[in-house]
């Protein structure tokens, strides 16, 4: 260690690199400590010397204010080498930021990593306070613990060593006993457990028959497996999963003893009148007794309704048939089938009530119609679509009872169940629409996507925009619809008021007209389209546009099946034939609404009904003209992409990145150009930041482009549009630019210069600079001819190492570049390469 030559010095070191990213204070701090000086980490009143270099302005000002000696790092080095305390005035510190304005604050960011010191209570005051607080809290918890509370001991890995289970169980039981005693004193209702319920059912089976399923379903509701199953669980899922298995085994003994047919039949009749909710969520969460009291109130209301002659033999018949439907639907196991009477109240989905109504409707309908309906249900892809085909007769009969019950049970319904979707939609409708006058009106349902596609394929869309006619779409025959019914003569003529120009809008109008129509046969779909091909008063069928099908798909936006060649046919028979599964056809009736005068003027071949005379109307070539006009913009859009991209490109050269970013932003704002890295066939403008002769400038001159300065972009941005280029053309530096540009504008076809047209064949050396490809392109653009081999050429451009001929000129690359710049062939004598 050196001698303590600076023992009276208390120094504060602030030494940074000139760019303010590196802090070198630590090195000089070590040297000062070695020489016996004290180094302060902060600038306090004890500091006598400040070693300063490129430090903070505040440190400089503070040192000058206090009169502390400001020295440079050279003073420290001189003291170390001389081994003595050198005079500070010989090495004053310099402040480079002193003359800079005070508004500019120089940011400092040291790139050296900090020394990481692990926090301990000894070296960190905040950590020490937190540690002391935790120790006090732990001591307080230890003193407040009772003797009977067990103390749990843990190993280092976190596993439990000692757990006094006897004390835990005893304290748990004592707490339970206290709670039970309190509830008895307050006379609160105690919910019986499952074992107590089974014991009560053995003692009094007739009374507990309705109570046990309620509590069982509540236990099932509270089980984890039920909640994991979701809300859309069916009866099989709820009663067949693992969550109900324990309850099923517990109940087997008691259920086998319960064989009272009277009670089961009464409960089935009760379930017939009560619209049960689709899940167990209708149970009251307070206690089963409260729900039983609510149920008893509903039974009283039901008995009053029964006394008022609301229940009819039709309902009894519906009850029996609904029970059979329920058994067939869910295939109950032998154990559960014995208790289906009372589980029917709690777990039957709401759709079963709709099915009951459908079956009761079937009992009143003729056998033939019922067989058709069953056959169509079996054939249907989605049988649930048929649920809405019930009659309004049962709703008329049991209307008051259903209204009274629906008000009481609405809070228990699973509102988001898919079975309730159609009932929710029907609740929003007025009562007149909920009670239809006849069952046939239910066939006027909304069309599926497949049916819509088939209608589009078989429709004549050339009829858009010329002449109005009315099309009545009768009963459609497809897989999801039952066999076609006989069409009547009194078909509805409800015509939509909107004249459409697209098939989708026409179909929407068709649906609206179908809803407004009240015809007995349900032939209510009509929409108005316009047809140029048919004369006034012509009755014919719609034929598919086979020739222009692809155009039709582009215009309408269809993304589905291709045309299968199917055409719409009109049936002569009273009933339509069954359609094949692979090609669904639709019976379309096209009737024109004409006045009596027009009907008198019709030729004989066109008179009569379509049904009696199924003539075929072939689409002529000129009938597609209107439709082709409609889809022409779509074809052009498809060919050219979503939008037209700019055909002109702009190239930047000799331009720094800041200016390039400005140009890119201006081009994005004003549009009309796309940026290209090099000059190509589509380039029209070359922007040069500096008037330097670059390859892009020469290629731009050779192609007849505008060679402009950077100011053109700035002025265009100022005025908000691309302005005239001529004032900003660099014609002074590149005289050939305006000449080539004028020639390019005057040329009829693709522009090619004539500068080297009279010159002999040239060969460009592979060692030339600029590269061979660029030089060859320049010569070609200026009308010259380039050979791939040197023996065919009379001029060789660039350094050539082969055998030289006396008849061949060996010229420098500058000859080509200067000739293009000046737009004249320069004298070759000035560019000859040494032999």
Curated annotation (Swiss-Prot):
Top-level lineage group: Eukaryota
Pfam families (alphabetical): Microcephalin, PTCB-BRCT
Phosphothreonine sites (modified residues): 335
Region described as Disordered: 184-206, 346-376, 418-442, 557-582
Modified residues (Phosphoserine): 279, 287, 296, 333, 548
InterPro entries xref list: BRCT_dom, BRCT_dom_sf, Microcephalin-like, Microcephalin_mammal
Known role: Implicated in chromosome condensation and DNA damage induced cellular responses. May play a role in neurogenesis and regulation of the size of the cerebral cortex.
The protein's name in its UniProt record: Microcephalin
Organism classification: Eukaryota, Metazoa, Chordata, Craniata, Vertebrata
Gene expressing this chain: MCPH1
């Amino acid at each position: 260690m050196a001698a303590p030559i600076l023992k009276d010095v208390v120094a504060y070191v602030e030494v940074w690199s000139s760019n303010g990213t590196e802090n070198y204070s630590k090195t000089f701090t070590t040297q000062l400590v070695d020489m016996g000086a004290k180094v302060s980490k902060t600038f306090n009143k004890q500091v006598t010397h400040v070693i300063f270099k490129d430090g903070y302005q505040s440190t400089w000002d503070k040192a000058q204010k206090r009169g502390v000696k400001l020295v440079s790092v050279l003073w420290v080095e001189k003291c170390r080498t001389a081994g003595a305390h050198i005079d500070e005035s010989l090495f004053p510190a310099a402040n480079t930021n002193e003359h800079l304005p005070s508004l500019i604050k120089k940011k400092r960011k040291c790139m050296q990593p900090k020394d990481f010191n692990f926090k301990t209570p000894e070296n960190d005051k905040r950590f020490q306070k937190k540690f002391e607080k935790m120790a006090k809290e732990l001591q307080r918890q230890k003193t407040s613990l009772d003797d009977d509370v067990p103390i749990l001991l843990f190993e280092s890995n976190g596993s439990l060593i000692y757990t006094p289970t006897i004390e835990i169980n005893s304290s748990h039981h004592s707490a339970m006993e206290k709670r039970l005693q309190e509830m008895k004193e307050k006379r609160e209702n105690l919910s019986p457990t499952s074992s107590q319920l089974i014991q009560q059912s053995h003692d009094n089976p007739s009374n507990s028959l309705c109570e046990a399923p309620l509590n069982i379903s509540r236990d099932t509701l509270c089980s984890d497996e039920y909640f994991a199953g979701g809300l859309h669980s069916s009866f099989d899922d709820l009663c067949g999963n693992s969550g109900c298995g324990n309850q099923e085994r517990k109940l087997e003994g008691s259920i086998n003893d319960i064989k009272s047919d009277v009670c089961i039949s009464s409960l089935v009749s009760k379930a017939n009148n009560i619209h049960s909710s689709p899940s167990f969520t209708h149970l009251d969460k307070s206690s089963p007794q409260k729900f039983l009291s609510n149920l008893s109130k509903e039974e009283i209301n039901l008995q009053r309704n029964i006394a008022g002659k609301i229940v009819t033999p039709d309902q009894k018949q519906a009850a029996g048939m609904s029970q059979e439907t329920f058994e067939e639907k869910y295939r109950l196991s032998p154990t559960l089938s014995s208790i289906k009477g009372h589980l029917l109240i709690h777990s039957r989905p709401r759709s079963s009530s709709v099915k009951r109504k459908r079956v009761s409707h079937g009992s009143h309908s003729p056998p033939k119609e019922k067989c058709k309906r069953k056959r169509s249900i079996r054939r249907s892809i989605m049988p649930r679509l048929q649920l809405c085909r019930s009659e309004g007769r049962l709703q008329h009969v049991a209307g008051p009872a259903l209204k009274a019950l629906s008000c009481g049970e609405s809070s228990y319904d699973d509102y988001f169940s898919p079975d309730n979707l159609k009932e929710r939609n029907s609740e929003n409708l007025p009562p007149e629409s909920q009670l239809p006058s006849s069952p046939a009106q239910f066939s006027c349902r909304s069309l599926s996507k497949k049916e819509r596609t088939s209608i589009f394929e078989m429709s004549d869309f050339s009829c858009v925009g010329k002449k109005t006619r009315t099309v009545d779409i009768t009963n459609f025959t497809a897989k999801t619809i039952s066999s076609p019914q006989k069409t009547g003569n009194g078909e509805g003529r409800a015509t939509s008021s909107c004249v459409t120009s697209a098939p989708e809008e026409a179909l929407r109008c068709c649906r609206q007209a179908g809803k407004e129509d009240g015809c007995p046969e349900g032939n209510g779909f009509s929409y108005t389209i316009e047809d140029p091909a048919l004369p006034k008063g012509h009755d014919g069928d719609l034929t598919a546009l086979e020739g222009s099908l692809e155009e039709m798909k582009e215009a309408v936006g269809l993304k589905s099946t291709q045309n299968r060649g199917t055409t719409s046919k009109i049936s002569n028979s009273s009933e339509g034939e069954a359609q094949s599964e692979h090609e669904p056809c639709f019976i379309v009736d096209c009737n024109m609404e004409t006045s009596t005068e027009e009907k008198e003027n019709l030729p004989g071949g066109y008179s009569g009904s379509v049904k009696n005379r199924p003539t075929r109307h072939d689409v002529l070539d000129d009938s597609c003209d209107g439709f082709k006009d409609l889809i022409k913009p779509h074809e052009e859009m498809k060919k050219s992409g979503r939008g037209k991209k700019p055909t002109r490109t702009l190239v930047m050269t000799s331009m720094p990145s800041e200016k390039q970013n400005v140009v890119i932003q201006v081009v994005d704002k004003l549009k009309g150009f796309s940026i290209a890295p090099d000059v190509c066939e589509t380039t029209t403008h070359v922007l040069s930041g500096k008037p330097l002769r670059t390859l892009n400038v020469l290629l731009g001159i050779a192609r007849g482009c505008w060679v402009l300065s950077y100011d053109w972009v700035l002025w265009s941005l100022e005025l908000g549009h691309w302005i005239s280029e001529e004032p900003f053309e660099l014609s002074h530096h590149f005289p050939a630019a305006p000449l080539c540009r004028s020639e390019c504008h005057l040329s009829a076809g693709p522009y090619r210069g004539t500068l080297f047209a009279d010159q002999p064949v040239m060969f460009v050396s592979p060692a030339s600079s600029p590269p061979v490809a660029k030089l060859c392109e320049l010569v070609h653009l200026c009308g010259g001819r380039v050979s791939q081999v040197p023996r065919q050429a009379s001029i060789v451009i660039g350094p050539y190492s082969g055998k030289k001929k006396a008849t061949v000129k060996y010229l420098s690359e500058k000859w080509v570049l200067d000739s293009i710049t000046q737009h004249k062939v320069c004298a070759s004598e000035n560019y000859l390469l040494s032999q």
